[in-house]
Structure formats: C-alpha cells, structure tokens
Design a protein with these regions (language model features):
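Short, non-ligating residues that shape and space the ligands of small metal-coordination modules
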Residues: 199-203
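Cys/His-enriched microdomains
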Residues: 191
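Conserved phosphate-interacting/catalytic interface
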Residues: 1-188, 229-581
Length: 581
C-alpha cells in the first residue's frame, strides 16, 4: 500500500506538471563545466545558492540516477551528469599517489564516456551531446585548463561532487533538454510488478531515496546479495519484483516530498515524517504545524493552523469534507536502508475529526502568557528531562501521532514521563511547561476507553468528587495559604510534600492541614474566613478514612490536574479573584 499510494501521488502531480516525466529527476548539481560547441573548456561555474544560511546546489531536471553498488559500481555511469570521478577521472581525495584510486577514476571515466556515446547514437544531431564528445576528444588539454580554474580547488574539496556540462550560450545543463532521447535500458528481467499488477521490466536495484541522515545509497526497498533472503535463487530486487516504471514513480514522489523546500515532511530526532493527501486540501498544507516546532520566521504559524482546524466546522477554513485519503509515513534511515516505523492511511474527513478531538482533549485553562493551542513537540519537550527530546524513548513520538490521527488513547508512557517530571521539577521553568503537562494528563485520562470516572473539564470543576482530584485541590489551597502567610519563599510545601501527598495522602494530610492552621492565623480576617470556607468545602468531600493507601498512576494524574485547576483559579485577573485583601 505504501508504494501504491506513492505511485498514485506521482501520477497526480505529474499530470499537473509538478513532477518530472518518467526517466528524469530533480537533481542538485553544485558545479557546471561550461564548454563551447567545439568541446573547448570555458570555465567552471558554481550553482550554489544561500538558502536559510546554508549553501544549496541549484536543482535541474536531469536524467534519473541509476542505482549502483558493490565492487563493480564503476561500470554504471549516470546519463550526462555524475560525480567528478566519472566526469573528470579524478581520484578520491585527489590522491595521485594512490594507484588504486587513479585506476578507479579512469575506469569510472571510461564508463561515463561510453554512456555519452550511447546517448549520442540516439541523438546524432544534438549540438550539446556532440560538444561533450568533442570535450573528451581533447580531454588532456581541457583537464589542464580545468585545473587552473579558480573554482577547481573548491570543486575537489569533497569527494562525490556532482557536475554536468553546459553550453556557453545556454542557461541550463545539456542533460536538462527533455527532447534528448535517453533510450530505455535493456533488461532481461521481466515479471509481474507487485505495485501495478502488470508484466513489465523489473528493477533489480531500486533507486535511492534522498533522506536526511541516510548515508550514501539509502533505499526503501533493497536486498543484499547472498544474504539468505533470496527466494527460488532470485537475486536482489527480483525477490520483491517492482517494475522500473513503478520504482521511478515511487522514488520520485518520495524524493519530492522529502525535498528541502517541501512542506510535506518534518523531523523528530533521527526520524523523518512524510505526509500527503490524494486531493488538494488545506489540511495537507497545515499538517506539519500540528506536530512540529513553529518556523523561526513565523512563530505563531502552528497556533494559527490548529485554530483554523478547530474553527473549520463553522468557517470552512479547512475543507475536511473532501472525499479523499490522507497518508502518513515515519521513516528511520541507516547507512544503507530505510526502516518504516509507522504507516497511516485514513480519510481526510476522519483524520480532521480525530485531530479536532485530540486538541479539544488537550484544551485546559492556562495563563494569558501561554499559546492558545499546544503542538506535539512542545508537549513532548515538557515531559523530557532538561526539555531535550533526545531523552525520550523514540517510540513515544510515533505513538502520540498515531493516537492523534486514529483517535486512540494516549500512550501510558507519556503519562509516566509526565508524572516523573512533575515530581522531579515541582516548579517548572515556565507557565507553558506547566500547562503542557496538565493538558497531557487531562487528555490521557479523558481518552481512556475504560475510564469510569467523571470526565475532566477544561477549568476547575467544583462538582468533581473524585478523591484524588479533591486532594490535588486541597494541596493547592494549603500551598496558597502558606504563600500568603509567609510571603516570597525559596521553597513551599510543594517542594517537600508534593510527591508524598500525590501518592500516599493519608501519611501527610493531617500534618499539612495542622500546619495550614498556623499559616491562617497570620492572614487578615477576611482571608481567614475565605480560605477556611474553601478548605472546609473541599475537605468535607474527602473521605479520609476511605482513601487508598496508594494512589494509582491515573489518580496521581487526577491529583495533578486538581492541583493545577485550583492554582489557575487563584491566578485569574484581579477583578475575577475572590480573595479579600
């Protein structure tokens, strides 16, 4: 289903002219060898541009790259472009004392020239290709001039730098001319394609995917020779037959989705998250903002995207009634292969509804300093040690995304990490962090399928008689009394007693209630009456004798939300506060 969905995406985008035709791809070429129509070298030209502070090679629509690997990879040359070993016979690291590297460069160059001749035989009157052949007819002379060019040192700074040829009077590389006939590669291997269901030439080696941290030749589909996974003596790609056309379609689609300027992917640690829809929809444009960090040049973009989603039923901003599918793919690359960690296929309408429910479940009263909605990354940062995402289990992100998209309960692992951080950091760095933790616990509890308790509300619920929730409220009241009685403190009862009160309230409740009586004596008469009444109203609903010896993790979560709700009630605007000064 993954490959079929990618092929369908390619077909749709190619029909709109947004993807290259079969046999071509968008390729970054950092340097061009400029020649005249006689094949004489003119100059080296850099195409690199400054994009977001980084140098990026200009993209050209060139003949699609061929897969190559193993000790005979030198024999496979790309069509009209390749790295400096193939195009200029340069040895690795420019080490002319390494005889093996010199021979390899020469063999690569011979393969490239043979490929140019093959294409020239199909395009006998093409001026550009004939100029390349003429260039190699006077190769030694041209190489002497290339080595004196001011950009030569920069060109050879890194191995594997791709280059192509450009005629001096043209603006694009010679290979960018789509009228050039490339000729289909002959293959003896034909079979039933698993993607299209048609009998076609099979790709023995699938094309590589340009993914971050993916090494040199990462592939989504690959087989190692003689690895023990060969069926019926079939080698490599013949074990899972995918046609050359389908291989081209799915890799072109995936590489387009992964392109630097594409908004159809984002990153989480070493994972790459790719998504797309089979019909144009605002949800596809906004999807990454639901889960990623906001862009530096538009810090409110995430909140705007979520706000549009939440208002969509009334405003029509996000047309979630579109009858189409939405796809999500989480990939984790290594040196040679790409692991699929998560694959989601759902309808646009269903996913929009599930996402709306997800953000509604996360909605909780908060300070005016906090953002209106919480994207996933800030949420996860709030429960990570030192707010570093690398300190979280890799699977947590995938499970959170899956919960949001499918409308499932949140992973218990998220609850556990959240409670750990609350106990380890009684006073979080910011109101946003505190809000995120409370929001996560509220969403976790309300989405439990077997939750027999009252649903937790966005703000303080005085009708909620859950014992853990009431204990949390009581603890917040006792802490507030202490703060008003003793002024600014380096530490409050929260620093010393939060962990024990939230786990085993019976052990410390009586002691803290007695302590609060001493604190009440230091308040004004009006404050004493107000807090005595508030404390009494909560305590009369707590069955002290019936409290469990230990609160479960779910009840510890209710305690945390009760505490948070009550604290937020205290810190409303002055005109809404009931405290008597």
């Amino acid at each position: 289903m993954i490959l079929q969905a990618l092929c369908e995406y390619y077909d749709r985008m190619a029909a709109l002219g947004k993807m290259p035709s079969f046999g071509r791809e968008w390729k970054g070429i950092p340097y061009l060898i400029v020649i005249d129509d006689k094949g004489n070298f003119v100059k080296l030209e850099s195409t690199e541009e400054d994009v977001d502070g980084k140098k990026r090679a200009k993209q050209f629509c060139l003949p699609h790259g061929k897969g190559r690997s193993g000790k005979n990879s030198w024999a496979v040359a790309q069509s009209l472009w390749d790295h400096t070993g193939y195009v200029l016979a340069l040895p690795k690291k420019m080490n002319y004392e390494d005889k093996k590297a010199i021979v390899t460069g020469q063999k690569q160059n011979a393969s490239f020239i043979a490929e140019v001749r093959r294409i020239a035989s199909l395009n006998e009157h093409d001026k550009g290709i004939l100029a390349i052949l003429s260039f190699y007819g006077k190769f030694e002379e041209n190489m002497k001039r290339i080595k004196t060019d001011s950009l030569f040192e920069q060109l050879t700074k890194n191995d594997g730098t791709n280059v192509a040829f450009r005629l001096i009077e043209e603006e694009t590389p010679i290979g960018a001319d789509t009228s050039i006939a490339l000729g289909d590669e002959e293959t003896e291997d034909t079979g039933l394609c698993l993607v299209t269901g048609k009998r076609l030439p099979i790709a023995v080696i699938n094309s590589k995917v340009n993914i971050k941290n993916g090494g040199t030749t990462p592939k989504l589909v690959s087989f190692q020779k003689g690895s023990g996974f060969d069926s019926y003596h079939k080698q490599q790609g013949l074990n899972a037959p995918i046609s050359v056309q389908a291989d081209y379609a799915y890799t072109t689609a995936l590489n387009t989705l992964l392109a630097p300027k594409s908004r159809n992917h984002f990153f989480f640690n070493n994972d790459t998250i790719v998504f797309w829809a089979d019909k144009d929809n605002q949800l596809e444009d906004d999807f990454s903002f639901f889960f990623s960090m906001p862009p530096k040049d538009d810090p409110n973009r995430n909140v705007e995207a979520i706000s549009n989603l939440m208002k969509a039923p009334w405003t029509g901003t996000v047309n979630d009634q579109t009858k189409g599918n939405f796809y999500l793919l989480v990939l984790s690359p290594n040196n040679a292969r790409i692991a699929v960690k998560l694959w989601e296929e759902t309808t646009i309408q269903q996913m929009a509804g599930n996402l709306r429910d997800y953000f509604s479940d996360l909605d909780i009263v908060h300070s005016s300093k906090c953002r209106a909605y919480v994207p996933l990354i800030p949420l996860l940062k709030s429960v990570a040690l030192q707010e570093d995402l690398k300190n979280l289990p890799p699977a947590l992100f995938q499970e959170m995304v899956r919960s949001a998209i499918e409308g499932l309960p949140l992973p218990r692992l998220a609850q556990q990490h959240c409670l750990q951080r609350i106990k380890a950091e009684p006073h979080p760095k910011s109101a946003e962090t505190e809000r995120c933790r409370a929001a996560l616990l509220k969403a976790y509890l309300n989405r439990l399928h077997d939750n027999q308790n009252k649903q937790l509300t966005m703000a303080l619920d005085v009708e909620n008689k859950n014992q853990a929730y009431l204990c949390g409220r009581l603890f917040a009241i006792l802490e507030r009394i202490q703060e008003l009685a003793q002024g600014d403190l380096n530490a409050t009862i929260k620093d010393r007693y939060y962990g024990s009160f939230s786990r085993t309230p019976n052990l410390v409740m009586a002691r803290l209630v007695d302590l609060s009586n001493h604190h009440l004596a230091k308040l004004s008469k009006g404050q004493q009456v107000y807090f005595e009444r508030m404390k009494g109203q909560v305590m009369e609903s707590i069955n002290a004798a019936g409290l469990p010896a230990h609160f479960s993790l779910d009840d510890q979560s209710r305690f945390a939300i009760g505490y948070y709700h009550q604290r937020q009630e205290f810190f409303k605007k002055k005109e809404e506060q009931l405290e008597t000064k």
